Amino acid sequence: MSQQTTIRKLAELVNTPVDKLLVQLAEAGMKFSGPDQVVTSTEKMKLLGFLRRTHGKAETPAEAASEAAKKITLNRRKLQEVTVSAGRTKTTVNVEVRQKRTYVKSENEGSGRATPMTPDEERADILAKLAASRQRNLDEQQRLAESDRVRDEEIQRKRDEEQAAKDRAEAERKAAEEAAAAASAPAPVAAAPTPSAAAPAARAPSSPSSAPRPSRPGGASPASRPSTPARPDDRNNAAKHKTRGSHVMVAGVEDDDATKRFAGQLHLSAADRARRSNVRGKPTGRPGSSSSRRGNDNGRGSNQANSGPHGFERPTAPVVREVAIGETITVADLAQKLALKGGDVVKALFKMGVMATITQSIDHDTAALVTEELGHKAVRADNADFEDALLAHAEDAQGDTTTRPPVVTIMGHVDHGKTSLLDYIRRTKIASGEAGGITQHIGAYHVETDRGVISFLDTPGHAAFTSMRARGAKITDIVVLVVAADDGVMPQTKEAVAHAKAAGVPLIVAVNKIDKAGADPLRVKNELLAENVVAEDFGGDTQFIEVSAKVGTGVDTLLDAISLQAEVLELKAVAEGRASGTVIESSLDKGRGPVATVLVQQGALKRGDYLVCGIQYGRVRALFDETGHQPGSAGPSIPVQVLGLSGVPEAGDDFVVVDDERLAKDVAQQRETKRRESRLVASATNRMEDILAQMGKGEGQQVLNLVIKADVQGSVEALKQSLVALSNEDIRINVIHSGVGGITESDANSAAASKATIIGFNVRADASARKIVESNGVDLRYFSIIYDVIDQVKQVASGLLGVEIREEIMGIAQVRDVFRSSKFGAVAGCMIIEGVVKRSKPIRVLRDSVVVFEGELESLRRFKENVDEVRNGNECGIGVKAYNDVKAGDQIECFERIEVARTL
């Protein structure tokens, strides 16, 4: 180092704080006033030597060698065998003992003494050493005595505090018992002393501050024992065996009782005896108890039952619990929360008319009723922890709002030209691609016009797609109601008006097909007036635009009306951040997996985002628009197809983009659990209703089982609703399974097991499914138009109903007189007053409009000739088989039974 090294620089070089370095220099005998002073090389070496001496190291290699020469270490190893008894046998164990000794040569050894000490000097040296040793022993004894005194005082203080706490708890317990006894007693006894006055007197002797403790028979108390200084050897033994229980020795357990207690245990040390005495003979602190009277005789007094604050007390009143119940709960969980047996809860449910097992789930209302019936209070549990986290996650994504394109839904009756109108706007040929020329899916498109971007939703007009139209009206901004000028208002037109009003969405009426010869726009306005849709011409606020989807008349005016209505609504949304929206349609593509058509309502949906969609979740693998292109992102009011979900979501579910997959998975699993529990509760209720219905109706009702598979979720929903609605009191349509995608082997097995008919709507069965269908004779039918599905199911259901026997009255004959015949008995002379009477047909005899006989017409004669029939206005003789009580004035009704095929 340089000669001009300062203390600060030296501290940086040796990585030591400046203050510490100044202290070390001062200890080495070098005084410096500040860190900026210069340190010479000599001073550095002096500091280094001081530090080496301080840490016990030699300053130079020569000194280190000399230090090593003064030490010698000897290692000794000795082997021996030890015999150990293990049960009845003895085992020899080899034991190796290793010893290590280090000998250090003193400095003066070997060098000799220059002047040997005289005997007087040696004696003085020995006396000085003895005096120093004696003084050290006295100091150590005083220190130990002081520490023992402090420890004893601390132990006594803790005991006093524990005793006071026990006394307070005992007093409170007695006061509670006396209050309960006074409340249950019929009348207080005046001569009896009050417990509150007797309690302090009973507790007075036990208080350490009020009275001295009785001395033990074996010796004096710790307070009266003289404090004699302990011998050094005793102190050493006490220091060697110091344990947790040593304070009991100080408190005076070395008495006769202790000697008797540990008789035969002389191998125990004093500390071990004290610890065992502390554990076995701890006093209960209750004067007058059996343990206090007997003392600590053999430690048995501590086995008495402790009636302190930790003892069991029987409740004096029923315990009312507050039970948190979610949407669903199993009977076993409810019983656990009520602290009851599961059988008791099941019995209570049976008394309420609910048949449930201990593992079955019940809904919140049923659980709340049975909880209140059992005397407890039910509260609704908050199970929306993940939902709350998702809501907070979505609220954090709020940002600046910008103007967004309008979402326009095209609604109307079937075949009124909705898709054709949208086709003209988009300049494509969509209508020709739909089976039967009708729309069976929700088509979502966005169109760039001269007036900006407009997103269109084309909904089906068929009656089976009610839920699709309701879903379209829910997420839309403007509804364009298409009405054919030649047909006028139809049932689905009225339904579309109701959906628009329920959603609070403004309505624009497009009167289509005005180019046809029978078009009457005024008729449309008048018919819609009955539905409270008032045109602007009539003083209302609804725009009526006359258009022609075939030639394009009025389409530009319709777009202007849509843009004007959007400006009035001032539609805004957050264009950046995490996206959220609604699922319009979903399907299962064999090559791409689950595909969901979503409408973004907030934020921007990008590739790679994690999203929760109903009970499904996943990462967006790809985005597709209606033209098949892959946009980079989709903003508000833009419909896109999403790939990458874990399953097919339900149409109408909301989706939210989250930051991580963990939150998405947790939310989806919680929703799936809730939906499954609700479905189990509903299915159990339905099964019970089915059992009761079968008990009431017998075996008369037929059941038609169906398995429905379709290409998109909306079609599955529409088919289920339409087919189940065909059920009546004679036949029940039961959809045992429905789903999206092709017909698989499991679908075929389910249909074979339940003897169901498989309906494939725009889907086909794979090879394994076809093999099962052929081998088991399962009825498999393919459809592409929903009309055909409904008609075919009606025919199949009608075939299950069989035929109906109907009675048709053919003619009525009035009895004018009765004749006797040896061959036929009584023969009625009749006049045919209605219809035709034929031979060998069943008849009824009516007397005063009451049926008195039902049988068969045996003989029919006219002018003594047998005839097959007699018509109205003619006279005849009628012989009734096995009936002779015919009287004048009776009516004979002739009828026939015919079979009529039953239909739905």
Curated annotation (Swiss-Prot):
Residues 178-230, 285-303 have a biased composition (Low complexity). Coiled coil: none annotated. Transmembrane segments: none annotated. GO terms for cellular component: cytosol. Residues 134-248, 267-315 are annotated as: Disordered. Residues 403-572 form the tr-type G domain. GO terms for molecular function: GTP binding; GTPase activity; guanosine tetraphosphate binding; translation initiation factor activity. Residues 512-515 are annotated as: G4. It is found in: Cytoplasm. Residues 437-441 are annotated as: G2. Residues 458-461 are annotated as: G3. Residues 548-550 are annotated as: G5. GTP binds at residues 412-419, 458-462, 512-515. InterPro entries: DNA-bd_dom_put_sf, EF-G-like_DII, EFTu-like_2, IF2_assoc_dom_bac, IF2_II, IF2_N, P-loop_NTPase, Small_GTP-bd. Keywords: Cytoplasm, GTP-binding, Initiation factor, Nucleotide-binding, Protein biosynthesis. Its main location: cytoplasm. Belongs to the TRAFAC class translation factor GTPase superfamily. Classic translation factor GTPase family. IF-2 subfamily. One of the essential components for the initiation of protein synthesis. Protects formylmethionyl-tRNA from spontaneous hydrolysis and promotes its binding to the 30S ribosomal subunits. Also involved in the hydrolysis of GTP during the formation of the 70S ribosomal complex. This is Translation initiation factor IF-2. It comes from Xanthomonas oryzae pv. oryzae (strain PXO99A).
